[in-house]
Every structure is written in C-alpha cells, then in structure tokens.
Amino acid sequence: MIDDHSSSSLVVPASIQDSSQGVLSAAVVLVMYGDYQCPRSAAVYKLIKIIRQELTVSFGEDYLCFIFRHFPQIQIHPQAQRAAQAAEAAAAQGKFWLMSDTLFDHQQRLENGYLVEYANDLGLDIPQFLKELSKQVHVDRINEDIESGCKSGITAAPVLFINNIRYTERWNTTDLMAAMIAASH
C-alpha cells in the first residue's frame, strides 16, 4: 500500500472522458491510478480483473464500473509514459483494455518496437498508431490524469478510489471485494 493521506477523496470525479469498463451509474465506481511499468500496478490491475469477474457473476454487469487513469512515474519507470501513449492510441481505435492487458502482461518489454508489435497483434491500424505516437497526440490526456491524481494527493501509483474514497486497506481479493460491497450499501 502506498500511504499518502494528504487527501482521502477523489477530487476529479469519474466521467465519460475516462477509460471505463461498466456504466458510471454503477453501485461501485472504482478508479485506479496506475503505471504500466510498475509491478505493483500490474498486480493490482490483475486483482481488479479477477474481482470484476466475480462481482459481475454475483451482482450483474452494472454493479462495478472500473476506470483506469494514467499515473506514469517517469523518474523510476522511463517507459511508462510511452506505454500510456500507446494505450491511448489503442483507445482511439477501441482497444484500450486489450492494450492495457498486454502492457501489464509484458511490462518488462515496453520499448517502441514492442509497442508496435503489440498494436499489430491487436489488429490496430499501424500507420495511425505510429502517427499518434510520433506526434504525441495523447500527451495532454495523460497529463490530465496525472494532474487529477496530484489534486487527490497521489504521489505514486498504484492508488485506488472506491466511490470517490481512497482505498487504504490491504491489496488482496477478500479485503478489496469487501470494501467494494460495503461501499455499494
């Protein structure tokens, strides 16, 4: 757990501009600030995928809305910013979540050549993908995520907010799922 209690609330609420799985009117809105090169972010992302499946089976599709916001820590993860740009370029072609899965699964291989390989594997329009990366089309979008995280007191990823309240308990399936269920009541 990253402890920074300078803020316990999400200052910039979830919106349609966010990359999301589920509806914003869900009983539980989970916002994750993550870094594609950070091992802890990858572990939490994978944990959320498992929990999302379990909650969907138990409570239905519209119970949980999962939102991912970029918080690349370039001082310790030099490829995280470029990976975030690749995810946003994939999002422009409707493949944000598939690219995010791939980036977290292969976070030791985030150099440009690999990013193009992943884009190709996902069936993206490669000339468009490369154009967006070279022109840094998505940098402002990523910076908005970083700025929103900073406004909420975040200094390092990963950080989770459940229904706008920072999650500070243990990072495991049982505790995280219990916190989500409690937040929905």
Role assignments for model-derived ranges:
Residues D4-H5, S9-P13, M32-G34, Y45-T56, ...:
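C-terminal cap of thioredoxin/glutaredoxin-like
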Residues S20-S25, S58-F59, G153:
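Short glycine/proline-enriched loop/turn "hinge" motifs that connect secondary-structure elements
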Residues S25-A27, Y63, A83, A156-A157:
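A structure-centric signal for secondary-structure junctions around beta-strands
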Residues V31-N120, I181:
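Structural alpha/beta surface segment adjacent to cysteine/selenocysteine redox centers
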Residues S20-Q21, L110, Y167:
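Short clusters of hydrophobic/aromatic residues that line enzyme substrate/ligand-binding pockets
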Residues L10-V28:
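A short beta-strand-turn-helix
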